[in-house]
Amino acid sequence: MGVATTLQPPTTSKTLQKQHLEAVGAYQYVLTFLFMGPFFSLLVFVLLFTSLWPFSVFYLVWLYVDWDTPNQGGRRSEWIRNRAIWRQLRDYYPVKLVKTAELPPDRNYVLGAHPHGIMCTGFLCNFSTESNGFSQLFPGLRPWLAVLAGLFYLPVYRDYIMSFGLCPVSRQSLDFILSQPQLGQAVVIMVGGAHEALYSVPGEHCLTLQKRKGFVRLALRHGASLVPVYSFGENDIFRLKAFATGSWQHWCQLTFKKLMGFSPCIFWGRGLFSATSWGLLPFAVPITTVVGRPIPVPQRLHPTEEEVNHYHALYMTALEQLFEEHKESCGVPASTCLTFI
């Protein structure tokens, strides 16, 4: 089939009010991504030592009772996923979703999402909200964006991200989703993970993939088709201070990742009120998420290494082909190549 894209608003000049609304949409996502989890964790702790301590105790009891919910499908809210603020976030860059092939809802899928970028903006916008009409482009599919399991330990923030359909990137959680009797489950895994964020340099396309094979094993165990997904522009919305491999700064980043599960990055965007100053507002660079063709995978409860390596190689080839087919239409120079590490 031909390429299908999401419907975008007419490309007319934006009013000042529209520009402000888009900036608010982009900025609130950054602030939520960076600070909501730590803020509510600290708040719940501090309230224990005030007259409002019953609120913290009540929530901690609820947290104990609700502990396994993220690994059992979470609590998705279509009301949250359809809010207008996500359309403002979409229009700020803008973010587009491109469909290159049909994904029939009579089977399950494991979508490998690349690159991770700093904040996975394109993937959240396209798979965790309806701002680009995922359910219309892929009718019958139920998307799940798999993220760092540690995020679901953070009070209040865990409930917030569950409402988008986010789930822990853990075997227990993903096995639960792909074992549901209702087919059409589409698990989106950012294969490069937090380590790949260290290579989120504008203009570069470096993926941590050569040794990442867990997603292939997952697909084999459940007979779920593999689907390559590439988000052009994801690395371009922030500037990153990249440290040379082997430097003490890079060593500190890797050590921190081993301890905490994510890599601390030094990054910056533009100022909220001035495009020439530094700040946390991302640069308004177009993000185009291209969903590739499905790769049929047989079900193997105990896949061999040969089978894993075979389908991993097929996936890498399909991903590279997807990149080559769409890079020029997405503003990437023809001479640019995809790099796997």
From Swiss-Prot:
Keywords: Acyltransferase, Cytoplasm, Endoplasmic reticulum, Glycerol metabolism, Glycoprotein, Lipid biosynthesis, Lipid metabolism, Membrane, Transferase, Transmembrane, Transmembrane helix, Ubl conjugation. It is an enzyme of class 2 (transferase). Selectively expressed in the digestive system. Highly expressed in the ileum, and at lower level in jejunum, duodenum, colon, cecum and the rectum. Not expressed in the stomach and the esophagus and trachea. Expressed at very low level in liver. It comes from the Eukaryota. InterPro entries: DAGAT. Glycans are attached at residue 126. GO terms for biological process: glycerol metabolic process; monoacylglycerol biosynthetic process; triglyceride biosynthetic process. GO terms for molecular function: 2-acylglycerol O-acyltransferase activity; diacylglycerol O-acyltransferase activity. This is 2-acylglycerol O-acyltransferase 3. It comes from Homo sapiens (Human).
